């Protein structure tokens, strides 16, 4: 049913200290909205500094799509307090606006109302905005306003020294990369458990479907929302942030070199569909190039191997240089039951699950099995709470009840929890006991709880009431780790950093694009 992890768990129980010092970081996106729930038409608030260069507060696709970024930390409480302070400071400087508390947007009548994120006049800033212009023209702007939470995770070097028998990160980078790729393969095989518990987009506003074809059997709430009775995360479905043009890319997770090779091939592979758009229209750039991927970040994935880049390095070149440094989990919807979009239970569960993914045997995965794994995910995304829902084991081999597979996994996770709790208290085991109950009571999952609220109040009504409640909560509570002085210092520093960037440009934007936009970066619409 699931891999036999008993030997690895026994090893872990004999080496409990190797898990003390897990490093984490959180990125949370949220839309700025008006009091009636429409997208804010204002620019990025000046009190938040420059989104291009601010360390903690930036923008994602749209000018109204805020993104909060915590520094790397090994203390869960400190990370969540830091994230809370970013929300507190922002709320204090949003006078007539609120932060939308859900993944799926509402009240967007027209895509032309969505302003792309603006990053100033430097070449790098203009490049980032043009990349977003390309996303808009390729996939539509509405899809890009969907919000999520990204969780960055890395195991301490002490774990790898004991697990892979290495001496340090540099000499052991291949073993560490292999370990993280093992994690990724198991994530594809069993990560559907994340939307089962934490998917929080079982319904969408009717406006989200305007002009879009779907064969999904939506039902309507009295307030006009469209929902699937057992859905968990429509954000992760074909209606959400996915990219069908990437479905035939040969990107695998067995070896770092082949992963990078597949990624580089995709950013050089011409797309007939995107070539029809052209790179310029009426003399204005509308995308970086006409390849399947404009840049590597365009690759849609529920999890990514990462390394901090140096200078102008691409993400894949950074991986080749130093190996995988950490993992970015991208399957979390916004948690609507907390002002900051993510909570401690989720973080502790992800720790447990990702550690299990490293420990469990993970045979190499071909394209066929990857497609089978995606089918499992899709079943959970669209019908995860359906009574008797089953999960495919392998490709067409057999199907097992989701609850049965989940409970078998939790028997292992409880052993991991006891090891982690030896570093600090009993909270990991408590998380296991709390979540395991949801297999028998799926109405307790985020999607189950949220759907009941949406049926009663509508997405707009419930979302706006939460947005106002959280706004008042944030503005009326004190900072926990940061200060107004710290925020003001970072605001001023971000302004200076952006000004320095703009002064340092020595070539035109056209020349910059020739250097950085990859092949197939000229041509007009056909």
Curated annotation (Swiss-Prot):
Write the Enzyme Commission number(s) for this entry.
6.3.2.2
Q: What are its GO cellular component terms?
A: cytosol
Q: Name one GO biological process term.
A: glutathione biosynthetic process
Q: Which family does it belong to?
A: Belongs to the glutamate--cysteine ligase type 1 family. Type 1 subfamily.
Sorted alphabetically, the keyword list is: ATP-binding, Glutathione biosynthesis, Ligase, Nucleotide-binding
Instruction: Please state the pathway this protein functions in, per its UniProt record.
Output: Sulfur metabolism; glutathione biosynthesis; glutathione from L-cysteine and L-glutamate: step 1/2
Reaction(s) the record says it catalyses: L-cysteine + L-glutamate + ATP = gamma-L-glutamyl-L-cysteine + ADP + phosphate + H(+)
Q: What is this protein called?
A: Glutamate--cysteine ligase
Q: Which HAMAP family match?
A: Glu_cys_ligase (MF_00578)
At the highest ranks, the source species' classification is: Bacteria, Pseudomonadati, Pseudomonadota, Gammaproteobacteria, Enterobacterales
Q: What sort of enzyme, by top EC class, is this?
A: ligase
Q: Give one GO molecular function term.
A: metal ion binding
What range does the record give for the signal peptide?
none
Q: Which SUPFAM superfamilies match?
A: Glutamine synthetase/guanido kinase
